[in-house]
Amino acid sequence: MNRNYLASSIGLLFACAIGAVAAQAAEPAADYKINPEYTSTSPDGATTVEQYARISADGDYTWQFWARRQDKLTLLKPEQPDYAAGFRFTSDSRWLVRMQKTGAGYASLYLYRLGPQGFVAATAKPLSDLAGAYFKRRPESRKIRKPDFHIEAGLVKGTDDNYRSLGQDWPDSRYLVISLSGEVSPNSRHGQLRSVRGWRCRYDLQKGTFDVPPDFAEINAKAIAPER
């Protein structure tokens, strides 16, 4: 048998084996059990987000999040210790936001988009990290004490009606409204301070950029005003 042919055949078999293993891995491991309480469905009914937990011998939880579409599962990374998550779809069912508690007083946001293979990460970093970095570049952030703990990012309710409930008239499934909060650790000069309390910005899903609409001016001024 020709050596080149043999090498090619072995390589092809190896690649097929790897592909088969990868295909088999596209589902939760046997020790992860679904918790139906946290299952959610997209507005068009085509995608279901399922949450699976693995419980260690010590009672510690590790959560995985899977999007099921046409009987195909895709993992919504990363997995999370201790806490289940909340999920919201845009009204066109093509974008998915994960609202993730990560600790006492801490919360992050992850953004996923619908692609040919199902839902995948839409940003290289968590959406909450990008929003926090945007806030730090804003001039108003230089007027306050910098939050250093209890950092929380939340998705403001309104994706289901494109924020018309907030009085907005934006294009369908175009924007997300994000709320940021954070505290300053106590020291010898002051106690624990909530220096940011629900500051809002808007994320453009088409452009991948942030801005602050004029309508947010009043609520944002209150969000960073000194506590009385």
Show the residue positions of the predicted features.
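Bacterial N-terminal signal peptides that target proteins for export
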Residues: 1-11
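Bacterial N-terminal signal peptides
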Residues: 9-20
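Acidic, small-residue rich beta-repeat scaffolds with periodic aromatic anchors
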Residues: 19-35, 108, 116-228
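Beta-strand-rich domains and repeat architectures in extracellular enzymes and scaffolds
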Residues: 30-61
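Residue-level detector of Asp-centered blade-edge/turn motifs that repeat once per structural unit
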Residues: 91-92
